[in-house]
Amino acid sequence: MDISHHKMLGKPNWGKQKQTLALMHKARDEGIPVICDQYPYTCNMTTLNACMTPWYFANGFHAMTDQLKDKDFRAKLKAEMEDPATPYDNYYLNAGGWGGVYVYSASKTPEAEGHFITEYADSIGKDPWEAFFDMCVANNCETGGVYSSMCDEDVCEIIRDPTASWAATV
């Protein structure tokens, strides 16, 4: 068994690598070949829309973009994203909020690229939520983000484990 990109994503999971590594060692002791890889950094990268509740994308990016133009929908989505009980892998909360979400791609709003959402919002004089939603609308929800969602100690412990190797997605 190969566990690819073994990580503890999001603050609620920090420290749980002790349990997962113990399970891997137990399996190996029982004759099950288990290995893993981990990239040597504390961020994960995907689209910025990954931090929004996924069920609103059922009709595609264009439909979601249209919904994001409505202030009542924005308020509903914000409440869902801020609620840890909302049942989805919440990248916004995993990153500790907008201060941990970095924009690497936003072709229609290039001034956002290279900045955390909070920095970008400050630079344009907007609330981070408004800046995020406006950027998503301008880019038809086709943006890229980097999420600061892991801690150094967890990453280092996994990499030091004899079952692990380094990996990188390029």
Residue map of PLM features:
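Active-site neighborhoods of metal-dependent hydrolases
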Residues: 4-170
